[in-house]
From Swiss-Prot:
Any Gene Ontology CC annotation: cytoplasm
Subcellular location: Cytoplasm
NCBIfam families per UniProt: gcp_kae1, T6A_TsaD_YgjD
Binding-site residues, Fe cation: H118, H122, D312
Reaction equation(s) it catalyzes: L-threonylcarbamoyladenylate + adenosine(37) in tRNA = N(6)-L-threonylcarbamoyladenosine(37) in tRNA + AMP + H(+)
Binding site for substrate: T141, A142, S143, G144, G145, D174, G187, N284
Name of the protein this chain belongs to: tRNA N6-adenosine threonylcarbamoyltransferase
Cofactor binding description: Binds 1 Fe(2+) ion per subunit.
E.C. designation(s): 2.3.1.234
Function: Required for the formation of a threonylcarbamoyl group on adenosine at position 37 (t(6)A37) in tRNAs that read codons beginning with adenine. Is involved in the transfer of the threonylcarbamoyl moiety of threonylcarbamoyl-AMP (TC-AMP) to the N6 group of A37, together with TsaE and TsaB. TsaD likely plays a direct catalytic role in this reaction.
Organism per entry: Desulfotalea psychrophila (strain LSv54 / DSM 12343)
Amino acid sequence: MYSRKINMIILGIESSCDDTSAAVVIDGTAIQSNVISGQEEIHNCFGGVVPELASRSHLSAIQPVVEKALSDAKISLDDIDLIATTQGPGLSGSLLVGYSYAKSLSLVKKIPFVGVDHMAGHALAILLEEETPDFPFIALTASGGTSSIFLVKSSTDFELLGRTRDDAAGEAFDKVAKVLGLPYPGGPHIAAHAETGDEKSIKFPRAWLDKDGFDFSFSGLKTAVLNYHNKIVQKNGSITKEERADICASFQQAVIDVLVTKTINAARTHGISTVVLGGGVSSNRALRLAFSHECDKCKLQFFVPAAKLCTDNAAMIAVAGYHKYLRFGPGNLSDDVYSRSQLG
């Protein structure tokens, strides 16, 4: 256990996919700045993230984003006590930009450095809110790259209970959006169309996999949506606005049913009374409402961060890095990035 400096100032850096972000957080709780530079316009015409374009965009964005985070917090690099950056999982080229930049700052300014697992950031983002859960809790981290359920015993002790076996929830949203001719990223656009659709109109499959397990699979659902869409197009030449809305609503509900059911089952199985939601998919309003309703019905406490802390951001990385540093000390500058999560 490393001694904690009062009012420790952490610089967080995130570049795991297509968002370049830098944040300044004090003591793992107080956000002083949280700057995010997205790449939606770059990738929209491709219907998804192009890794090479993403890494190039990070290269041009990282310096000004960090400078703005420091400026917004009204501090300089000389005031930073710890640098925390995403080490994985994610796109290797994207990860390397933020990770290498953070290590360079650490070497030049002689500031302690720690690499952070992106999923830990999503699970601990709730600690940035005024109302926070007690440990242990069950955390669902649902994003574009992965969907996982963790038993979070402390801020540095995670047990992996279940993960996606193929497409993650966010990835399924993006792929279905592309099929329906909706822009990238798909989640917000599907959610918007779903508001005017009937979630009971189409019986899309729910992949429960093992009855008592907590793994996810959304590739079958994605294929079912593709086949349903193609049948309508083959018959009528195109789909109507109403048909698109019904597809969005029915698809979204199928994802929600699986995420909610498996997460609550994990809490029941392990005797945990608190559920925490994190990751980009958790900004979905229908998912939040479903979790709130089911947790209330099951007498479970439910926590979810503000939407701005659910999508990829450096503030959550700063929080996870702060706690990791206090327990394990500074990271090894010779370590490399990793594409698959090593959490739990």
